[in-house]
Structure formats: structure tokens, C-alpha cells
From Swiss-Prot:
This is Large ribosomal subunit protein bL9. Pfam families: Ribosomal_L9_C (PF03948), Ribosomal_L9_N (PF01281). It comes from the Bacteria. GO terms for molecular function: rRNA binding; structural constituent of ribosome. Belongs to the bacterial ribosomal protein bL9 family. Binds to the 23S rRNA. It comes from Shewanella baltica (strain OS155 / ATCC BAA-1091).
């Protein structure tokens, strides 16, 4: 299925690119989230008319993401208290949602989908540097300190 991208999509293309994707990916992800439209003559004309507006919107989102990245890197270490054993092994784990909630409580909005934990959830106490992807082009690092609850 050929679609016109309305947003920059990782590993697929940029705004305005006409790409061929599997029908299920288009129907279940790209079209419902407003990230693409079906590539037919009428949609091509509508897209070309709205191109400047969409590019301005993308630039504004990028600027907002850069601003949030600066705020996140300016944060001191975000402290998360969790129950732990004697050796520093946590009972449970600290995951994306916990980190996102702690950063949001510290004053910077962060969604759990923006937190990247490539090695899985944090299962020990200590200091960690966690990458957050705020935009396809903007990444930041937040310092997370996991401490044992008293």
C-alpha cells in the first residue's frame, strides 16, 4: 500500500515521502495515528496544499522537544526509592513508567513511551544514566538514582 507520510517516521522516511508499506502497518498504525494518508490523487493535492503548514508544525514540535531535552539534562539526579534486599537487589524492578513518573514529579513532562531501557528494567540500587527519546531527532540523558527504602 502506498502512503504519504505526514511526519518523520524512523526507518521509513520524512514528511512528504511516498512510501510503500504493508497494508496492516498502514491500516493499524500509520493511518489511525495520523502519521500518513493513502497516496491517491486527491490526497496528493491536499497534502501539497498543506505542506508548509505541516512543515511548520514539525519545526515547532522539534523546538519544543529541544527545550524539554535542555530541561531534562539540567535536572539533578532523579531519586526513586524502592524496596531492596541487603545486597542492593530490588524486590521488583524500576521500569519505564516509574522513571517517567519520577521525572514528571521533578517538573518536566515525560511519557513512559519516551524512556529507553535497552537492557530492560533496573533491578539493582545505584546510579544510572537513562536515555529518553523526546523526538525522532532529539535524545537526552536523565540521571536516575535508585535507593533502598528505609
Amino acid at each position: 500500500m502506498n502512503v504519504i507520510l505526514l511526519d518523520k517516521i524512523a526507518n521509513l522516511g520524512n514528511l512528504g515521502d511516498q512510501v510503500s508499506v504493508k497494508a496492516g502497518y498502514a491500516r493499524n498504525f500509520l493511518l489511525p495515528q495520523g502519521k500518513a494518508v493513502v497516496a491517491n490523487e486527491s490526497n496528493v493535492k491536499v497534502f501539497e496544499a498543506r505542506r508548509a503548514e505541516l512543515e511548520a508544525k514539525l519545526a515547532a514540535e522539534l523546538a519544543a522537544a529541544n527545550l524539554r531535552a535542555e530541561k531534562i539534562t539540567a535536572l539533578e539526579a532523579v531519586v526513586i526509592a524502592s524496596k531492596a534486599g541487603d545486597e542492593g537487589k530490588l524486590f521488583g524492578s524500576v521500569g519505564n513508567r516509574d522513571i517517567a513518573d519520577a521525572v514528571t514529579a521533578a517538573g518536566v513532562e515525560l511519557a513512559k513511551a519516551e524512556v529507553r531501557l535497552p537492557l530492560g528494567a533496573l533491578r539493582t540500587t545505584g546510579d544510572f544514566e537513562v536515555e529518553v527519546q523526546l523526538h525522532t531527532e532529539v535524545k537526552a540523558v536523565v540521571k536516575v538514582s535508585v535507593v533502598a527504602e528505609a
